[in-house]
Amino acid sequence: MSTVVTEINTTQVYQLYIKADPEQIWEAITQPDWTQKYFYGSRTSFDLRPGGHLHAVAGDDESQELVEGEVLEADPPRKLVHTWRALYDPELAGEEPSRVTWEIEQGEDGVSLLTVVHDRLEGAPKTAANVAGPGWMYVLSGLKTLLETGRPLS
């Protein structure tokens, strides 16, 4: 996996090749049954209309809210843009929402390029530090492993 992290306080860019078509990647990003297997056990659901909501929840009864956001743009299976506000820590929840952009490009031989940009982090320095560590790397490694092997990373 290729990772580029620039200006940690404002923009983080991650790129990786996944042996899967864009439709498979899109489904894995947007469907709670998939996200639960690689996104720290959270079930992430999207209302894929502009202004729609993003909710990531955990727990047997799904009562633990982890992340919330608003869908800004959805162009299946190529691009998804949404805001991001972490709720699992009171300090993070008190910060301004940031933005996450997922872009999926079809490549050759069944391989696609996934680019994830987490930006607008100027008002969310603790979030920036939190996701720059193992955060996005773990999530994206888990996504790649799941799609390529059919099994979760851990």
Feature roles, as predicted:
Residues 16, 67-73, 98-106:
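Hydrophobic/aromatic beta-strand elements that line small-molecule binding cavities or substrate pockets
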Residues 90-137:
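Beta-strand/loop substructures that line and gate deep hydrophobic ligand-binding cavities in soluble
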Residues 1-13:
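Short acidic N-proximal helix/loop "leader" segments that mark the beginning
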Residues 145-154:
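Short, highly charged C-terminal tails/helix-capping segments
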